[in-house]
Amino acid sequence: MKVLLVTGVLGLLLLIKWKSQSTSTSNQTCQCPTSPWVIYAFYNSLSLVLLLCHLIPEIKPIHTSYNTHDSSKQQHISINTGNGK
């Protein structure tokens, strides 16, 4: 999972670098946006988004379990996660 996170961040950085290069050289006629490393960067940033969407439901109950001020809210959350699985 850490490998996906690292490659996703690298892909996002490559995509940002490509975007900044394409805006600085906008007077050229052929920018060739389908070079292999741009496709690789797009794929890695997409995998990062999918990884984060997969991890967000797992992180949410951890944050809500530390909320000890409202016990009825805690019971409501635990019932919802129990029925959801």
UniProtKB/Swiss-Prot annotation:
Keywords from the named record: Host endoplasmic reticulum, Host membrane, Membrane, Transmembrane, Transmembrane helix, Transport, Viral movement protein
Segments passing through the bilayer: 3-23, 37-56
Subcellular location: Host endoplasmic reticulum membrane
Keyword Protein biosynthesis: no
Segments in the Cytoplasmic topological domain: 24-36
One GO CC term, this protein: membrane
Keyword Mitochondrion included in the entry's annotation: no
Record note on what altering T29V does: In strain: Infectious clone UK
Bilayer topology annotation: Multi-pass membrane protein
GO biological process entries: transport of virus in host, cell to cell
Residues in the Lumenal compartment per record: 1-2, 57-85
Role noted for this protein: Cell-to-cell movement function.
Membership in a protein family: Belongs to the carmovirus double gene block protein 2 family.
Record protein name field: Double gene block protein 2
